[in-house]
Regions:
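Short beta-strand scaffold positions
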Residues: 82-83, 156, 176-177
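Short, solvent-exposed aromatic-acidic interface loops
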Residues: 222-229
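Glycine-rich phosphate-binding loop signature in dinucleotide/nucleotide-binding domains
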Residues: 73-76, 165-171
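Phosphate-handling substructures
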Residues: 54, 96-159
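Secretory targeting and sorting signals
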Residues: 1-24
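Domain-level recognition of soluble alpha/beta enzyme cores
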Residues: 193-220
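Active-site-proximal alpha-helix that buttresses catalytic centers in soluble enzyme cores
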Residues: 25-105, 152
Length: 229
């Protein structure tokens, strides 16, 4: 099973999601996009290093296609963000070119580090890399990936990225991140996500979630699209 499939299977364990309260802060919209296919994806090995591998020729096609897809809906973005990893920045570039501004790099959008499991086969990730994230989704956020982060540390840094986007003044932002990071954070924090559906059809390269909300009152799923096929 691929890392994408394993992450999806783990998310079914996360059944209790954060419900929004009466809004006390203005809401914004954030579209979280998974990066296009990278050389790491194509290799079948876990690669969470920074800056990490580039996207493949197929990945470039996917990056172009998701830009057309998002802009084709008549959506006008006023902010663009990417992680510290080159594959998200390359995926963001066609959108950045269309917007006429470079992506702002946010460390909190980076992939969950594999720690001691870096470079191991993706097929084994369910018994290695994803053991701790499975515990996060079951409520134990103190579980740590050996040589990497625990659930509280991961959640805090992604929260900080979302806070930075909110504080920027952008009201319709697009942010490029990573499969495990997006799916895990969304399952932990976003109202309206169906873990069973996500488990059966995990986020593909250039798949995305559109969220509405704010860091104080919480986030709600507006729509999702598993773009790359």
């Amino acid at each position: 099973m691929s890392v994408r499939g394993i992450v999806g299977a783990l998310l079914i364990a996360c059944a209790v999601l954060t419900a929004p309260t009466a809004a006390a802060e203005p809401d914004i919209t954030v579209t979280l996009v998974r990066h296009a296919q990278s050389a790491g994806n194509a290799s079948g090995l876990i690669d969470t290093s920074t800056p990490g591998p580039s996207i493949t020729p197929l990945g470039q096609e996917q990056a172009d296609a998701v830009t057309v897809l998002l802009r084709g809906k008549g959506t006008v973005f006023d902010g663009i963000y990417a992680s510290t990893m080159i594959r998200t920045q390359q995926t963001a570039q066609p959108m950045a070119d269309a917007m006429g501004e470079p992506p702002t790099v946010l460390p909190g959008l980076r992939e969950i580090e594999a720690g001691v499991y870096e470079g191991e086969p993706e097929i084994a990730a369910g018994a290695t890399y994803f053991q701790a994230p499975m515990q996060w989704l079951r409520g134990d956020r103190t579980a740590r990936i050996p040589g990497s982060v625990d659930g509280n540390e991961f959640d805090a840094r992604f929260d900080q990225a979302m806070q930075t986007i909110y504080d920027s003044g952008d009201r319709n932002a697009v942010a490029y991140s990573h499969g495990a990071a997006i799916m895990t954070w969304v399952a932990m924090n976003v109202h309206g996500v169906d873990p069973a559906a996500l488990a059966s059809d995990p986020l593909r390269n250039t798949g995305y979630f559109v969220l509405r909300g704010n860091p104080v009152d919480g986030w709600t799923l507006v729509t999702e699209n598993n773009a790359a096929r």
